[in-house]
């Protein structure tokens, strides 16, 4: 018997695929149709969960902030070179995971006022 995918899982899959595609090709180089095709879902299904591409970007940025928070919280505990190395490694690891943000930051901020308000 086939298991039914829950709407929450579909939204998670959309975000995972979007992140991978945005990181690989840059956010401007990825259409919602490309994301739908990658997931083998209809564009309407994608738009049900994320009505606009900026909604995807905002959701991914929220994930980035969540991933970054524990790393930044550890900063005051850095007392030795080894701690600093680990802190920087962790910081760069999170930034690499969401590298599309930095790749196209100016364009994202000029188009997306919600993101601009969160960043600036």
What spans do the regions from the language model cover?
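N-terminal intrinsically disordered/low-complexity leader segments
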Residues: 1-9, 20
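Charged catalytic carboxylate motif
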Residues: 13, 67, 83, 87
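Helix-turn-helix
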Residues: 13, 21-55, 59
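Hydrophobic alpha-helical connector segments
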Residues: 59, 73-117
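Short, basic, alpha-helical segments at the C-terminal edge of helix-turn-helix-like DNA-binding modules
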Residues: 62-68
């Amino acid at each position: 018997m086939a298991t039914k995918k829950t709407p929450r899982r579909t939204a998670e899959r959309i975000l995972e695929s979007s992140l991978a595609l945005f990181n690989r090709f840059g956010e401007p180089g990825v259409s919602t149709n490309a994301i739908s095709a990658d997931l083998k879902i209809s564009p309407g299904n994608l738009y049900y969960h994320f009505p606009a591409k900026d909604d995807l970007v905002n959701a991914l940025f929220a994930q980035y902030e969540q991933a970054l928070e524990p790393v930044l919280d550890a900063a005051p505990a850095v007392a030795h070179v080894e701690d600093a190395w680990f802190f920087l490694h962790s910081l760069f690891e999170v930034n690499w995971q969401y590298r599309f943000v930095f790749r196209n930051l100016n364009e994202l901020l000029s188009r997306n006022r919600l993101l601009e308000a969160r960043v600036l």
